[in-house]
């Protein structure tokens, strides 16, 4: 499924705010000139923070951030991909797992 709209979610980053060789920042807006496709193209995120750990091992040094997708969004199961992503703020502690 692919749609255009505003979708809120969560994304996991390495301690230096990188993910898959791409540098992010918090806060920040990022765009890719791609048609998003889960597991293929775009910046990936999950609507629920706890779902992120289906794809990443829990590491207390990693960053978990609230994100908003503004562009096209592809969704498959509990994972989404977009071509326009805003990193809003870091979510600290284990409280994010309840989100």
Label for each model-derived stretch:
Residues 1-99:
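Short, glycine-biased loop/turn motifs at secondary-structure junctions and
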């Amino acid at each position: 499924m692919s749609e255009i709209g505003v979708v809120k979610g969560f994304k996991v980053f390495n301690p230096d705010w990188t993910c898959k060789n791409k540098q992010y920042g918090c806060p920040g807006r990022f765009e890719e000139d791609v048609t998003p496709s889960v597991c293929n193209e775009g910046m990936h995120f999950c609507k629920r923070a706890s779902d992120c750990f289906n794809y990443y091992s829990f590491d207390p040094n990693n960053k978990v951030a609230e994100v908003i997708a503004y562009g096209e969004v592809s969704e498959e199961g509990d994972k989404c991909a977009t071509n326009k992503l805003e990193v809003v703020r870091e979510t600290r502690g284990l409280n994010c797992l309840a989100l």
